[in-house]
Design a protein with these regions (language model features):
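Conserved Rossmann-fold NAD(P)-dependent oxidoreductase catalytic core, especially the SDR/UDP-sugar
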Residues: 1-47
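Active-site helix of classical SDR
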Residues: 49, 53-56
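Alpha-helical substrate-binding/gating segment
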Residues: 69, 82-97, 107-133, 142
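Active-site loop of classical SDR/Rossmann-like NAD(P)-dependent oxidoreductases
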Residues: 140-150
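Amphipathic terminal alpha-helices
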Residues: 165-190
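Conserved beta-loop-beta element that borders a ligand/cofactor-binding pocket
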Residues: 16, 58-86
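Residue-level signal for the nucleotide or nucleotide-sugar donor/cofactor binding architecture
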Residues: 55, 105-112, 148
Length: 190
């Protein structure tokens, strides 16, 4: 960030991680929370060092965005979800199928991630509600099972994801969540 400031870079787009706020997943899994909105008023909380490092870098970005170091360095931090194919092996030994369902909610397609990055770079004004050019967006597709909000990215940069993991892997989802003894809100009870 310092070098970007010194070299007169206007904006940085940073690959953050969903782990910057992964503490909330425990609340989501236990249904104590419905969805984690992607707004600047939700404090990121992580319960591991990797997430803490990502969270700290987001906060450091805010310092640079405020202009207290000479000028405002615009910051967009993208908490990337799961940019990979679904893996049925995550169902092994997990009767609730949580890792599999989590990846359904966290999935981001290459097309949607590209759109999110490009719009984060090209959108003219990214000022937040305090007039600070600093934003945090979740990098996920428009997934049926998403548990992170996209409202902020939709509103600020016009993000319009085109993919949904539920549609992309419809056959696999049906097979894996209804025929492998997975219990819970999806699938059948053995």
């Amino acid at each position: 960030l310092r070098l970007s400031l010194e070299e007169d870079v206007r904006r940085v787009v940073v690959a953050s991680s969903n782990h910057a706020a992964d503490f909330y997943e425990h609340l989501l899994r236990s249904r104590e929370m419905d969805m984690l909105p992607a707004t600047n008023d939700i404090r990121p909380l992580s319960d591991n060092y990797y997430g803490w490092a990502k969270e700290s870098y987001e906060h450091l970005g805010f310092v640079f965005a405020t202009g207290t170091l000479g000028r405002k360095l615009e910051n967009v931090h993208i908490r990337i979800g799961a940019p990979r194919s679904l893996d049925a092996a995550t169902l092994e030994g997990d009767r609730e199928g949580f890792p599999y369902r989590r990846n359904l909610g966290a999935y981001v397609s290459p097309r949607d991630l590209t759109q999110l990055m490009v719009k984060s770079i090209e959108t003219e004004n990214i000022d937040n509600e305090w007039g600070v050019p600093w934003q945090v967006f979740y990098g996920i597709s428009d997934n049926t099972r998403s548990f992170w909000g996209l409202e902020n990215a939709r509103r600020v940069i016009g993000y319009a994801p085109e993919d949904d993991s539920e549609v992309t892997w419809a056959t696999d989802v049906y097979e894996n969540l209804t025929t492998k003894g997975v219990i819970g809100r999806v699938g059948r009870v053995p």
